[in-house]
Structure formats: structure tokens, C-alpha cells
Amino acid sequence: MVQEVELKAPLFSDCTGDGTIGYLAGADYNMGRESRAEYGEELAPIQPDKMTMGSSVQWYSADKGKPTRFPIFSYGLQFNEKNCEKVTMGEWKWETGMNFNQIDDFERIRDYGLMVIYSNWSFLKNELKDNKKYKNRALDWVAYIAGKRESRRLLGDYILKQDDID
């Protein structure tokens, strides 16, 4: 049985990452980046495109006080001394999927994020020349759901533009 609910408030904020509440309520929305000319924003691309903000798979490691092991992740991405991320936790900059549909391709985006984490961590633990920092560390937590930033951009009474921030 479907129950219809009506909510009233002076302001609603849809923080689902996909604009799901607004979408289900029938709100207008855009996906991707608008052209520079649409809102007069100099940082926007000249032509519109489908690129969106990405999703991040968060993680952190912990010092276990003694050496820990991690399997060699040879079937993942190949990292080396130049392209590895020498970090002990994931941050929001570990973002992926900007060129995919953040709704329809979300599982693929999340899986790729996991592959990046495990591939990079394997390199740090097993191959990095100066890996003293990682010898006693182990992955302590890896999110199984990626954190979304934005897929649908809801269009309301006012649209925030670059000029509002500059």
C-alpha cells in the first residue's frame, strides 16, 4: 500500500546527492555542466557537457603497533613511486566517476573507487621503497557506499551562480 504524505515548510533542502526528493516531487533539474554563456560564468566550460561532481569512497588506516601484512593486489590498478598517493586515509579529493552517470552507473563508480584504494594500499605496503610509515598500519575501515556530491542539480526559485560567490 502506498501512502501519500504532504509536507509543508518555508524551505526544503534535498541533501540526497541525487536530488531524489526534488526529482520525486517533480522539480526541474539539470545534470552535467551548463555552458559558460548560460549563466555568464567564466569558470564554466564553453560548451555544456555531462560531467558531474564525483563520488568518494572514504577509508582510513590505523597503527597496530606491530608489522601488518596486506595482499599483493596485482589485478588492480598499477601504482608506482610517482603516481601513488602516500596517505593513511582517504579524503574527499579521492573522487571518481565524474564522466559517468552518478545514478545509473553508481555501482561501477563505487567499485572503481574500491579498486583504487586497495591497489594504492597494496603498493604502499608491498612495493614502496620507503614504506616505514606503513609497516605497522592496516586498513581499519573502508566505506562500502561512496559519498555522493551531486548528480541532479535541482532548479528552484533562485540558482546560485559564480557571481554570487566571487
Where are the predicted features?
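Flavin (FAD/FMN)-binding glycine-rich loop and adjacent Rossmann-like elements that form
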Residues: 1-166
